[in-house]
Amino acid sequence: AEAQRGGIVETIGDASYSFRLRNREIERFEDKHRGIFDLWDGFFGRGTKPTSTEVRDIIALGLVGGGMKDHEADKAVSKCGPDDLMRLFHISQAIVGVAFMPDAGDEDAKKKTAEADLID
């Protein structure tokens, strides 16, 4: 699978999934938990760390934004155990990060190409 702009593709268990947060998923998260910017700060130790529930909800909402139905996303996340939480934490951090900065990876690739051209 290829990631949409503002999304990522990651593997959970033995399946590859597309994740993307759109405004509607962000608003759903904020209605249930806290502001997305508070969550963002928490990922980097500048605020309250995300709870396991928040991490799982970002994963599920990212799956919905990536094209999955709500019940399918909930089922995929429910298969994850406590041993998956650190990986889910990092995936949820990436989901939010790429939603905020959808072209960041493209800029890094362009910069590397430009630097390589200068060396040649």
Stretch-by-stretch model annotation:
Residues 1-16, 27, 31-49, 53, ...:
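Charged interaction scaffolds used for protein-protein
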